[in-house]
């Protein structure tokens, strides 16, 4: 799709969507997204120009279908895939990608930490019509013997190679600083971000400042060259509700705001990663704080989980928080699967996480009154009231599951026309009963109250 669009800009010195937006140019990607979002191309351009929206679209990701992340558009969801040092299988990761696209993920992050990481990433990018994100420090760590052997040079090489492959956005943990580490020592769960913990160990062992912070402008130049977006990582996000909204989290967030302005100076699109584990009463404050400290850059949050007591069900504990934070203004929600805190998710875990987060993001969009976002809900409700089972299945987020649950007790095709399900049966179905009184008017009600003869009232068969 984008091959011709990108080719005609090949001689432009800067090719980021933010650069064009600031020049007043509405790109083909912006026009395409405007149709997908049912908003004007000029609004897309304006939001990208001011940094309140990003279009993660590496110039090297030719088969990408452009999308946007920002408060003026629909709330998006991300699916995490990728292998581990224990389990590595390209075919399995491509299957997870297929599930992610099928069930509605807007972006996918490849978080592979083992095996042939570049080969896995190449396969994923080549197969993906949606933006791909990565955390480059994982691959960088695989190239050195010890954490303390990491360096700016190794990281810059990895970032350049990933950008050339077509990665659309990268998580860079440049906001965790050496002076922040003492703020984490009294936490219940310490530093739970993999990237954050790696960099904390590096700083302590080398007695130096975070090299990602110190070479940040060099990273900006690479990302600008390929139009890769920053996803500024929250290396100090709280990993338990006991640690929510603490000094460490907000010290890093302030630094992320400063780095956002540096990235914008280079016309590099930027979003901010957020928590984590947050009690419900602190969620709105988290959004307000991010907008204030990070100049309204899009907020991309992991959950947040609103309680810590449900391993195996954290797609639910986090979807509750995700719906709330999406309503309050987060632009993208990173899914959590049932396997969170327990193990590497398989494709069914990926599906469960995506469905939970599609629900959360859609609920947030309804609450934010996005134009047309409720149309599907209303259509399904009308089909439900008509007992149009096939239409209900077709309109649902997961038609296969909806159909299989219905058919578990009423499998015969004849029941697809029935005016009841196995929950209530024909006698107690409220909608079936309600349909019988539809012709009862306000005049009929007044007649009842005035004591009119029964024969003069509407007759229900």
From Swiss-Prot:
Q: What is its EC number?
A: 4.1.99.17
Q: Which residues bind [4Fe-4S] cluster?
A: 421, 424, 429
Biological process terms in GO annotation: thiamine biosynthetic process; thiamine diphosphate biosynthetic process
- A single GO cellular-component term on record: cytosol
State a single Gene Ontology molecular function. zinc ion binding
Arranged from A to Z, the UniProt key words for this protein are: 4Fe-4S, Iron, Iron-sulfur, Lyase, Metal-binding, S-adenosyl-L-methionine, Thiamine biosynthesis, Zinc
Q: Which family does it belong to?
A: Belongs to the ThiC family.
What name goes with this protein?
Phosphomethylpyrimidine synthase
């Amino acid at each position: 799709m984008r091959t011709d669009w990108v080719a005609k800009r090949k001689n432009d010195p800067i090719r980021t969507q933010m650069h064009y937006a600031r020049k007043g140019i509405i790109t083909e990607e912006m026009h395409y997204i405007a149709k997908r979002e049912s908003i004007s191309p000029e609004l897309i351009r304006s939001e990208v120009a001011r940094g309140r929206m990003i279009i993660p679209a590496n110039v090297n990701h030719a088969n990408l279908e452009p999308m946007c992340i920002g408060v003026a558009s629909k709330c998006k969801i991300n699916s995490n895939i990728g292998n581990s040092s224990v389990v590595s299988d390209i075919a399995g990761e491509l299957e997870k990608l297929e599930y992610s696209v099928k069930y509605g993920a807007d972006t996918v992050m490849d978080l592979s930490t083992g095996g042939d990481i570049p080969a896995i990433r190449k396969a994923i990018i080549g197969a993906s019509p949606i933006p791909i994100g990565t955390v480059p420090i994982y691959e960088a760590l695989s190239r050195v013997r010890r954490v303390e052997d990491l360096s700016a040079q190794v990281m810059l090489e990895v970032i350049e190679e990933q950008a050339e492959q077509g990665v659309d956005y990268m998580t860079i943990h440049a906001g965790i600083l050496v002076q922040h580490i003492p703020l984490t020592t009294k936490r219940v769960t310490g530093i739970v971000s993999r990237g954050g913990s790696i960099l904390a160990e590096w700083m302590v062992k080398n007695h130096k400042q975070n090299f990602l912070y110190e070479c940040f402008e060099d990273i900006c130049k690479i990302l600008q060259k390929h139009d890769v977006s920053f996803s500024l990582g929250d290396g100090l996000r709280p990993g338990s509700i006991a640690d929510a909204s603490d000094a460490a989290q907000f010290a890093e967030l302030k630094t992320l705001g400063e780095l956002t302005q540096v990235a914008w100076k280079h016309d590099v699109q930027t979003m901010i990663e957020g928590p984590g584990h947050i009690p419900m009463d602190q969620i709105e404050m988290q959004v307000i704080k991010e907008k204030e400290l990070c100049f309204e850059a899009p907020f991309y949050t992991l959950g947040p989980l609103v309680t810590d007591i449900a391993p195996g069900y954290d797609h639910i504990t986090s979807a509750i928080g995700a719906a709330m934070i999406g309503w309050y203004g987060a632009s993208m929600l990173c899914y959590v699967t049932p396997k969170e805190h327990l193990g590497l998710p398989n494709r069914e875990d990926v599906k469960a996480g995506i469905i939970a987060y599609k629900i959360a993001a859609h609920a947030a969009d309804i609450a934010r009154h996005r134009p047309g976002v409720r149309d599907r809900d209303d259509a399904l409700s009308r089909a439900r009231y008509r007992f149009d089972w096939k239409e209900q299945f077709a309109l649902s987020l997961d038609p296969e599951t909806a159909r299989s649950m219905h058919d578990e007790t009423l499998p015969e095709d004849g029941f697809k026309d029935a005016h009841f399900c196995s929950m209530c049966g024909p006698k107690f179905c409220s909608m079936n009963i309600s349909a019988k009184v539809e012709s009862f008017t306000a005049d009929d009600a007044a007649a009842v109250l005035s004591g009119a003869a029964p024969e003069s009232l509407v007759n229900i068969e």
